[in-house]
C-alpha cells in the first residue's frame, strides 16, 4: 500500500481594509470546511441550542462577541485542509502584533488573501496592507472581492473593483494573482461554487488556496539559525534552540555564534555533537526545522536569544554600533512624526535592539516606490521611506536580497509596531 505523499503546509494571512470582511471570510472558510474553533462549539452546546441548527450567523456573532471582549479567538493558527494543501491561517491584521509576528518569523506567511469590499473598492488600508505584504516578502496574493451580495452580484461592479486592485498590485510587482468574486456572509464562491455569478468561471477561494505554490526551502543559502532559547542539559551540555531559516546543519560541523563572538572579542564556536527535533535525533537539519543542537565547548553564558548560528566558513553578518544600515521602511503607526535622532527598538528574527534614526534619505510613494521627496525633515504614518539606522548594540542583519529571512524587521515603541522594513545594505564604520 502506498502512503500518500505528505501534503505541503502553507501559511496564509488575511489582509485588507477594516470592515471589508476579513473575519467573516475566515469564519466562512472554517464553517464550510467544518473547522469552527472548539470553544465556540462548546458554547453552542452549553447554551442548549440543541434543537436549533448551528447557523453561520450565530457563529459570527459569537466570534464578534469574543473579539469585543478583547479575546481574539485564535483564528490565528487555525488549520484546515484542501485536497492538496494543509493550510494554517496565521493571522489577521486586527491583531495588534500582526506585523511584529510576521516579521520576527513567529509566522512566516507564504501567501496573503487580500479582501476588498465590492461596495467600497480599494481603500487606504487596502493599499497599506498590500505594500506591507510586499515589504514582508509575501510572494503570492489571492484577491477576494467580498460583499458581492450587496451589489447584487453585478459583473460590471466586480470588473471595476478588479481593475483598481490589479493596478495597485501590478505596481507593487505582483503578477498572476486570482481575483475572485465572493460573498462570505452568503457563502458564495468561498468553499461552495456560486450559481449567482454565472459570468464568473474562475476558482472559488478554497480552490485558489489549494493552488498556492509549495514554499521552496532555501537550502542553498548560507546557514542561519536565530536562537530562541539556550538550555544547559545535565550530561549533554549547552543546547541552543532555534529554527533553521536558511542553509543546512549537519552533525560534526563547526558553528559560530554572532553577535556573541563580536561582543566577547573571541570566537564563540564549537562542533555540533548532536541535533534533535521533536525529541528525535537528526543527522541533518533543513530550513523550517525547529531544532535543539548540542555544541561542544560553548557555555550557556556565551550565547542568548537573538544570537544567530552560522558556519565558520560563512558567519552571520554583524552590524556593530559603529556601523549603519540603509533600510526601506513603511511607517504604520506613529502618533506624531519621526525625525533624525528617534530611538525605538528594532525587532528582527529573535533579536531586539535599540536603534537610532541617523538620516532620512528619501520619502517614497508607497504604491510605486518612486522618490517623492529627498532628505525629508520628518516622516509620518502612511509614509514609505529610505533611512539610515544605527544599532545601539551589535545585531545580526543581512541584506534582504541575500538572506530575506534576516533582512526584515519591525520597529516598535510605546507598545506598538511603528514601522516595518527591510535592510538594503550595510555600511561599515571605522
From Swiss-Prot:
GO CC annotation: cytoplasm
- Which residue stretches belong to region G5? 183-185
* Positions annotated to bind Mg(2+): 23
Catalysed reaction, written as an equation: GTP + H2O = GDP + phosphate + H(+)
Q: Which cysteines are joined by disulfide bonds?
A: none
**Compartments reported by the entry:** Cytoplasm
Q: Which UniProt keywords apply?
A: Cytoplasm, Elongation factor, GTP-binding, Hydrolase, Magnesium, Metal-binding, Nucleotide-binding, Protein biosynthesis
Annotated tr-type G domain residues:
7-219
Q: Which stretches does the entry tag as region G2?
A: 70-74
Q: Which residues form a coiled coil?
A: none
Cite the residue spans of the region called G3. 91-94
Q: Which family does it belong to?
A: Belongs to the TRAFAC class translation factor GTPase superfamily. Classic translation factor GTPase family. EF-Tu/EF-1A subfamily.
Write the protein's name.
Elongation factor 1-alpha
The species is: Pyrococcus woesei
Record lineage: Archaea, Methanobacteriati, Methanobacteriota, Thermococci, Thermococcales
